Amino acid sequence: MKTVIIGGIAGGLSAASQIKRQAPDSEVVVLEKCGDVSYAACGMPYNLFYRDRPVEELYALSLETIRTGRGIDYRLRHEAVAIDAARQEVTVIDRQEEREYRESYDYLVYATGNRPNKLTQPGFDDTAVVYFKTLDDTRRLKSLIYEKAPRSALLVGAGYTNLEVADVLFNMKVRPVIVEKAPTILPAFSPEIREKVLEKIAEKGIEFHSGVDVLAKEGAVVRTSAGAFDADLAVVAIGVKPNTTLFAAAGGELGVAGAVKVDRYLRTSLPNLFAAGDCAEHYVRQLGRNGYMPLGPVANKQGRLVGSNIVNNGTMTMFAGIDQTAAFKFFDLTVATTGLNERQLQEAGAEYLKIFIDSPTRGAFTGGGTMRVLLLFVKGSGLLLGAQMIGQDVVAKRLDVLATAIYKQMTVFELAELDLSYAPPYAPVWDPLLVAANLAIKKA
């Protein structure tokens, strides 16, 4: 059995590793068009802060481990340029040798990830503009920061990525200015969570403008509908789109958000072709249908399952799905979410109740901070639909308790009965989750 995998970062390498683990004698070829092996892209903003720490420290595995230790034929700078689904062949260009060849397969895994949305306005193709997506982007941004010593940076887009970048730049004494086209930041979060992020932006003295159209970049000045801003460099992070050009050209069917349409086994519309990661749809358990939420853990889970399903083709396993759990850091705040959000519930016409509480994270005399817990739930039954949190100290791991509760379809009544650990260094005697659950019970 021979499997060819297009894309070797997250889902692709996970699929390759699982195939070799379960079927060591099978042939696995990974075609990765860039020069980097699988890496932790979510760590890129934090690497910026350390001039002497190479971006290669974000590699998940060394090339030697992948090739020798796992027995995977992992080819860097080999770009797949066409898929012939009928002949089960991939046309490849070796960018190092500049030669074209064809690679046959029994199974093909499409794991090409996503690509950044780009600005088409004049000036946003110059060298002082970074679309922060890959390790090469990180290398270039570090070079601009440490060699050009910029005093100001314009961040276009106010999502997770640029909020993390703003945090890092601020602490490097580079003045960030954030502009966002939408009316506000973080539209997937409830207003009660967004307001705490906006308070932190104001507290740090960071200039922020929403509802802004970017018009042009002229040298070190960016013109917008809100005026002109000095920008020694610009970081653009305005969302991503699934990288599906090659798949679509082969006649493959696309689905939600233009991602590769997959079934619950992660099979595509083309024969013997699976898809995983940021290029593919993701089954959302609570909605009972596919959605699109490109995150590293999801890509790795899908890749692992694809590898297993290829080996066990007669007894495949369904992808369990996602509950849209995510978290990010912004200065001393952790912002986290799981389950359905208000926008999704309103679009579905669903009735729901909402509560939020503010609570200390642990015993006051042990330090700690404060956190806000927000719950979305069904009146009467108390079924937990979604949860969001923001605050200092232990936030993300508490959010994981709520992610587990949503996975198990727990109610706020059951949540209030959980036997959570207590000691002053870790929690107040009434954990914030229990306080929130008890308030929800009063409304349910």
What label would you give each PLM region?
Residues 262, 276-340, 426-443:
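A conserved FAD-binding loop/helix module that cradles the flavin
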Residues 6, 103-113, 156, 229-239, ...:
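Short hydrophobic core segments
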Residues 125-147, 221-223, 228-308, 401, ...:
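FAD-site-proximal beta/loop scaffold in flavoenzymes
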Residues 1-73, 160, 166-189:
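Beta1-alpha1 glycine-rich phosphate/pyrophosphate-binding loop at the start
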Residues 59, 152-154, 160-215, 295-298, ...:
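Rossmann-like dinucleotide-binding cores of NAD(P)H-dependent redox enzymes
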Residues 6-10, 14, 18-25, 33-34, ...:
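Flexible, glycine-rich terminal cap/loop adjacent to redox cofactors
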Residues 110-172, 207, 262-264:
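Glycine-rich dinucleotide-binding loop and its adjacent helix/turn
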Residues 25-27, 69-96, 103, 171-262:
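A Rossmann-like FAD-binding core segment of flavoenzymes
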